[in-house]
């Protein structure tokens, strides 16, 4: 007889109405992990302005997101992810860790470059900061278009050319994608709204990656509304003057 699964509940930041999902890439990351694991779980949005007594008791002063697994409360996104990968394991649940270590780090500096770009109010610095963001996106594009070791046929003398894989580590979503995609989504939405900047079409690997990601329910259905992201960055994005 199969072992009964403990109750799993993810507490995430609520949006501006106090109910729908708010802008938080860490919350979306864990939402995606749980969905990909195929585990039964609940998601509870927490209005940060009015934390309920239940939430305060479970995680007094705790940062969102946090996880309730049975009676255990888990905090810290990285630790929660490690915990879920360890307890929700094969054969019952899929392993989500990337095979290639580079998949975990590729594109990770994009968000820092984006933050510097969007927070800058000095027009004289704008071009250089935009170039920094483009450079980081190009590094990701190069990784996505370069074949992974498992895509290379060592018996063939022909050049393997451009990788056609769907995601960072292959054709399935992994923990690496759960980490990067929510941040890339924010970059797209905020840069378009506050800088009129879009990811260049020349970055075909990045566009293919995002197109494949938006076709997956685990990503598309866990994204907050664009308006929530724009609102979260209203005070952060500095006008150039």
Swiss-Prot record:
Catalytic activity: L-dehydroascorbate + 2 glutathione = glutathione disulfide + L-ascorbate; chloride(in) = chloride(out); iodide(out) = iodide(in); thiocyanate(in) = thiocyanate(out)
Renumbered ranges of motif G-site: 24-27
UniProt signal peptide: none
TM helices/strands, residue ranges: 26-46
Modified residues (N-acetylalanine): 2
Domain GST C-terminal: 93-233
Protein's GO biological process: chloride transport; positive regulation of osteoblast differentiation; regulation of mitochondrial membrane potential
Pfam families: CLIC-like_N, GST_C_2
Tissue-by-tissue expression: Expressed in neonatal and adult cardiomyocytes (at protein level).
Enzyme Commission code(s) on record: 1.8.-.-, 1.8.5.1
Family recorded in the similarity comment: Belongs to the chloride channel CLIC family.
Protein name according to UniProt: Chloride intracellular channel protein 1
Gene behind the chain: Clic1
